[in-house]
Amino acid sequence: MNSMAPVITIDGPSGSGKGTVAGLIARELGWKLLDSGALYRLLAFNASNHGVDLTNEELLTKLAAHLDVQFIAAEPGKLQQIILEGEDVSNVIRTETVGAGASMVASLPAVRDALLVRQREFREVPGLIADGRDMGTVVFPDAPLKVFLTASAEERARRRYLQLKGKGEDVSLSSLLDEIRARDERDTQRAVAPLKPAADAIQLDSTELSIEQVLQRIRSEIAQRDLI
């Protein structure tokens, strides 16, 4: 970790486009990338690979502290690569089984503390783009640029619907909207690190904006702060 390396945090609710935007900005600047939302899935997957029980807080904490992972920003229109211990696990960590495991490990306080430290270790020169829900409020409160990206629940459901339809999945727009609203409720009301913009965050509503328009706004904020 290099505490002097600049960090740009991009937080927001599920489906806001923060992952896409974070990857594109990281690729454009040549900076490191952190997808914090994937870390619990990665830990659950890694624990299963090493035969560690998902209720063993002590061993999980040790795994979390030494999680060997790299996020590689993808070209526009493609998914980012997630490399765990030298293996591309971008797709395998997205299964329902891994997701259930991620929920289990995320409930363990010592694991959360260990992953907080691990996230901060991603801060390296020339800089870091950190994507998540509490990057600007908890993980990198000193970041020189914090972005809170949102969109209406209806628009986020529509985007997710089109994404899943494109993969050939049979989904209902109304059920996706219900899921997103429920997720928003959980994220904003939870006791630990609730989803909310940092006091000094730039808030961007992307409901009516294209990805390029969002990128242009962030580029402008980067230039104003002389971050590159």
Swiss-Prot record:
One of its GO terms (molecular function) is dCMP kinase activity. ATP binds at G12, P13, S14, G15, S16, G17, K18, G19, T20. The gene is cmk. HAMAP family: Cytidyl_kinase_type1 (MF_00238). Gene3D superfamilies: P-loop containing nucleotide triphosphate hydrolases. One of its GO terms (cellular component) is cytosol. This is Cytidylate kinase. Its main location: cytoplasm. Belongs to the cytidylate kinase family. Type 1 subfamily. It comes from the Bacteria. Keywords: ATP-binding, Cytoplasm, Kinase, Nucleotide-binding, Transferase.
